[in-house]
Amino acid sequence: MKIIRVQDQLEGGKVAFSLLKESLAEGATTLGLATGSTPITFYQELVNSDLDCSALTSINLDEYVGLPVENDQSYDYFMRDQLFNAKPFKESFLPNGLADDLEAEVKRYDQVIAEHPIDFQILGIGRNGHIGFNEPGTSFAEKTHVVDLQASTIEANSRFFASIDDVPKQAISMGIASIMASKMIVLLAFGKEKAAAIKGMVSGPVTEALPASVLQQHDNVVVIIDEAAASELD
């Protein structure tokens, strides 16, 4: 696990984008993408670059259950707004949170991942150590699955909604085993509220109680953090 300390989120996005360019030069064609506030500066770098994404495939980590794609809090909307409208990809996959049969959708998404192995995966990390929507206690062997979101995650995401009652209670998430199958993983974290999770991820025991700790077992992980997120590291 390589750790790169940066001044702020802006620099973090630039560093992540430079790593992406290196991966693309080495033949990467499939990107695993994340949502939320953490990767926004990475997407801004991508949008403002001259990079042509028309031959690339993207696979998103997760999507809320029950939100229409036109809802501005759906991850489908987020990805179009932050990236795809400006930089169309050859193919862009997200879980369908409106599927009538969620278990069938889970199987479909596992098939998508199997057919498009991820070369470069962007991750954030939750305060409780979640990656994707893989909450504490999720099996490291889990593939795509329907998640009941923990209260801490619902509370953290409520800032994006009019009321905490509007936050979806479930999501479809790529599993930890799916994430670990990526060739390269770049995890971004900024702010003091992520410091405890970063410490556990980097130097704590590998435990399903802190999902991100499994990244210690991956042979190509780069962690990009600001000083606040790094503040509990030795």
Swiss-Prot record:
Residues annotated as the enzyme's active site: 62 (proton acceptor), 128 (for ring-opening step), 130 (proton acceptor), 135 (for ring-opening step)
Pathway participation: Amino-sugar metabolism; N-acetylneuraminate degradation; D-fructose 6-phosphate from N-acetylneuraminate: step 5/5
Gene3D superfamilies: 3.40.50.1360
EC number(s) recorded for this UniProt protein: 3.5.99.6
MF (Gene Ontology): glucosamine-6-phosphate deaminase activity; identical protein binding
A GO cellular component annotation in the UniProt record: cytoplasm
Top-rank EC class of the record's enzyme: hydrolase
Keywords per UniProt: Carbohydrate metabolism, Hydrolase
Catalytic activity: alpha-D-glucosamine 6-phosphate + H2O = beta-D-fructose 6-phosphate + NH4(+)
Listed GO biological process terms: carbohydrate metabolic process; glucosamine catabolic process; N-acetylglucosamine catabolic process; N-acetylneuraminate catabolic process
InterPro entries linked to this entry: Glc/Gal-6P_isomerase, Glucosamine6P_isomerase, Glucosamine6P_isomerase_CS, NagB/RpiA_transferase-like
Cross-referenced Pfam families: Glucosamine_iso
Function: Catalyzes the reversible isomerization-deamination of glucosamine 6-phosphate (GlcN6P) to form fructose 6-phosphate (Fru6P) and ammonium ion.
Family: Belongs to the glucosamine/galactosamine-6-phosphate isomerase family. NagB subfamily.
Protein name: Glucosamine-6-phosphate deaminase
Originating organism: Streptococcus equi subsp. zooepidemicus (strain MGCS10565)
